[in-house]
Amino acid sequence: MSKSSHTYVLLSLAFIIVNLLTLNHLRPWIDEVMMLDTAYNAAFHGRWETTAWYRVVGQYPFPTYPPLYQMLAAAWMRLFGSSLVAVRSINLLLTFLLGGACLRMMKRQGLALSVWATVLFTLLLWGTGEMAWMYRNGRPDMLCALLVATAILAARRYLASESPSTRIAVIAASAALACSGLQAVVYLCALWSFCFIAHRERRKPYIRLLVLMLTGFSLGIPSVALFMLAHGRLVAFASSIVQYSATLSSLALTVVPWAGDVLGFDAAPYTQKLLQLTTKMSLGQRLLSIAAYRSFLILAAITLAAYISCYRNSLRLLLSDAGFLMWLFALCTPIVMVLAGRFPVYYHWMAFLPLLLSVTLMAVRSRVWCAVFCVAAFTMSAFGIRSMLPDGQGDYSRLQSFIGRQAFKKSDVVVCPFSVFYEIKPLCDTCYFAGIFPTEYISHADYIIEAPDGDAYDQPVTDYLNKLKADSTLTITAIDTCENPSLTLYQVKKKHE
């Protein structure tokens, strides 16, 4: 193993240890519970179902996200348990593998990475606030990023040597990518388009590469569709794709009412959901929201200055430099994603990773700029440490103690906020996360856990509690409370019991 590889492994292990000690500083949130509730039920109850999802096109809630991450998480839970630290640590492993794939990508470029360039790369990968937030929660974004890196490595091998094995690798990587998240498919297609434009002299190999990628997508996406069809949720799956893309939503709002008139079905439930989820922000406002990604913009500005200083006498050489092209793609990515749909914080890896590669390539070339980037990386890591500090939403150990001292039975039905997910799931087989799950599907509840000082996603639990309080046949009794975080446990009983 080379010095640079040793450096990456040792620094990454240090970050992993720090993260394992601080993962509970970020309380469970809506996306995390939505993704992992299905995985938990599959791992410990053998059922692919959830009580932490929303109703789609009038059907009972069902997880309509491509299932690869949930399947991986279910296997992980079976092996390592379902505690917060155990489950979230899967993303630490995926991030470590992602970094290794990126380093391999650069070595395939013929680069001899210095120790300091590797330190720079590792600090920016693990230490920046946006990346730390992404790998510290239970979303599937690190899996998507890793599979994108894997697909790029497979594509580079294919472009270097077109053989049956490299063709199969591209198809397999593309199929797996489609099963991990359709946003990653859009991203890989955008990257291919950028490379196709940038490498005009190699357009025929790139066209053949596109055919292989599309073959992989045509295997992966139908596999997901068949999975949804087997569970009777194909229409819900298609609807969930449309409703989270601004472009497809606008098109659907035009096409669906027309299709309803022609085919004779009620289009109102579909259009109502689309209107509910369609962003109220204009395209200009969505583009301006990119400015909130400050660390990315600052690092991009420093990187641009570095490349201009190295190529100030030759624009042609600048535009043909691989590192500068990565910088350009990183800058284009937020714009493309906004035009395609949206660019929330958990998609920021799409812009950050090509920028990280661009920075590292420049650091290898210039010791002066390597020093400048290292100063920036240490500064950004110092600010990034804040994401590892308590999130200000309460002491998680208090929450653990609060849930642990209750006498719940496996058969109890509990309505609760997302924050108690990891603690309540092992205790009760039926837990409704009413922050998103429609309460009309809850036939009864034995206990309700309210978070009075919670966020907007905790309010539906309070609304459900107030609804039961208004029922004259029920007795609602507060039996325990917790402070920091603020939680109240209510027992629900029929008056004749």
What does each of the following model-derived ranges do?
Residues 208-276, 292-299:
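Membrane-lumen/periplasm interface segments of specific transmembrane helices
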Residues 29, 133-143, 344:
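Short acidic/glycine- and proline-prone juxtamembrane loop motifs at membrane-interface regions
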Residues 141-147, 186, 324, 331-367:
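Hydrophobic/aromatic-rich transmembrane helices and adjacent perimembrane loops
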Residues 23, 389-396, 404-456, 481, ...:
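Short periplasmic/luminal acceptor-recognition loop of GT-C membrane glycosyltransferases, typified by
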Residues 17-20, 35-61, 68-71:
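Extracytosolic helix-loop segments that constitute the early lumenal/periplasmic catalytic or substrate-binding loops
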Residues 122, 149, 166-182, 218-219, ...:
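Membrane-interface alpha helices of multi-pass inner-membrane proteins
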Residues 67-71, 79-97, 134, 138, ...:
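Loop-to-helix entry region of an early transmembrane alpha helix in multi-pass inner-membrane enzymes
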Residues 2-4, 107-115, 162-163, 199-211, ...:
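Membrane-interface helix-loop-helix junctions at transmembrane boundaries of multi-pass membrane enzymes
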